[in-house]
Curated annotation (Swiss-Prot):
Keywords: Activator, Amino-acid biosynthesis, Cysteine biosynthesis, Cytoplasm, DNA-binding, Transcription, Transcription regulation. Residues 19-38 bind DNA. It holds the Pfam family LysR_substrate. Homotetramer. Residues 1-59 form the HTH lysR-type domain. Belongs to the LysR transcriptional regulatory family. The gene is cysB. It comes from Salmonella typhimurium (strain LT2 / SGSC1412 / ATCC 700720). This is HTH-type transcriptional regulator CysB. InterPro entries: LysR_subst-bd, Tscrpt_reg_HTH_LysR, WH-like_DNA-bd_sf, WH_DNA-bd_sf.
Length: 324
């Protein structure tokens, strides 16, 4: 059994059982991957993949367990390399972050600017996607950190640390009837067409929950994953915008009126997560603390030692998180 064989079977699964696509991604040949997979199956005496002719059709029950363990083994191999790098070049390496557009556009720029200035030899890579894509990227080892708010149930296999609370604002054009009000009730908001986030992005679930709580149904006429797109369509008069407060900039958006909506919606919590098996380099600890100052190295280590995210939630229950 070779590490290369384990990497091949994991990557085949990552590429939806498409061996040709896997070969392209690994810069190797399709016959070479197929041969190594067969050799591993012969050595183990079981099929990892079910086949129809030359095509892989699904992962067998035994194969699912083998793939899970192979991921753990490869994660440990990466950890060994990280340990070596920490002792050889503590300020040199790479950092892969998976996050949403809102975090990348509004919450992270200052953090990343300071981080790059401090660690010029650390290459920083950002992957933007949906919460599901973010979870997959970190779970599969394609990203080191997940930074997200929505769909946190997808992250049960990760250590998730709370970073900050945030809430929403209503945005309208100056000639809109709501522009003259300093506060808006959810009943008043329900009377207008809404422009907001796509379900599963940037606290959208809390918007739906708030309307359900009031026994109302929101009239959502347009959704997008990007707050800048939402603001564009508010300017076009399509409806009333509901977006993260951090996405409203008085200097960049002088033609929009912002109304605080914290009385209507409960706050949401953004978290940073990583695989439990990840060896955190010194610069990774520093990135976490730059993003969330209360997450010192000692606090992170204490949280990692806990057995579940429920215990981590309890650990932070009495800690006041920053508000954005």
């Amino acid at each position: 059994m070779k590490l290369q064989q384990l990497r091949y079977i994991v990557e085949v699964v990552n590429h939806n059982l498409n061996v040709s696509s896997t070969a392209e991604g690994l810069y190797t040949s399709q016959p070479g991957i197929s041969k190594q997979v067969r050799m591993l199956e012969d050595e183990l005496g079981i099929q990892i993949f079910a086949r129809s002719g030359k095509h892989l059709t699904q992962v067998t029950p035994a194969g699912q367990e083998i793939i899970r363990i192979a991921r753990e083994v490869l994660s440990k191999v990466d950890a060994i390399k990280s340990v070596a790098g920490e002792h050889t070049w503590p300020d040199k390496g790479s950092l892969y972050i998976a996050t949403t557009h809102t975090q990348a556009r509004y919450a992270l720029p200052g953090v990343i600017k300071g981080f790059i200035e401090r660690y010029p030899r650390v290459s920083l890579h950002m992957h933007q996607g949906s919460p599901t894509q973010i979870a997959e990227a970190v779970s599969k080892g394609n990203a080191d950190f997940a930074i997200a708010t929505e769909a946190l149930h997808l992250y049960d296999d990760l250590v998730m640390l709370p970073c900050y609370h945030w809430n929403r604002s209503i945005v309208v054009t100056p000639d809109h009837p709501l522009a003259a009000t300093s506060s808006v009730t959810i009943e008043a908001l329900a009377q207008y067409p809404l422009v907001t986030y796509t379900f599963g992005f940037t606290g959208r679930s809390e918007l739906d929950t708030a309307f359900n709580r009031a026994g109302l149904t929101p009239r959502i006429v347009f959704t997008a994953t990007d707050a800048d797109v939402i603001k564009t369509y508010v300017r076009l008069g399509l409806g009333v915008g509901v977006i993260a407060s951090m996405a409203v900039d008085p200097l960049a958006d002088p033609d929009l009126v912002r109304i605080d909506a914290h009385d209507i919606f409960s706050h949401s919590t953004t978290k940073i997560g990583f695989r439990r098996s990840t060896f955190l380099r010194s610069y990774m600890y520093d990135f976490i603390q730059r993003f969330a100052p209360h997450l010192t190295r000692d606090v992170v280590d204490t949280a990692v030692a806990l057995r579940s995210n429920e215990e981590i939630e309890a650990m932070f229950q009495d800690i006041k998180l920053p508000e954005k």
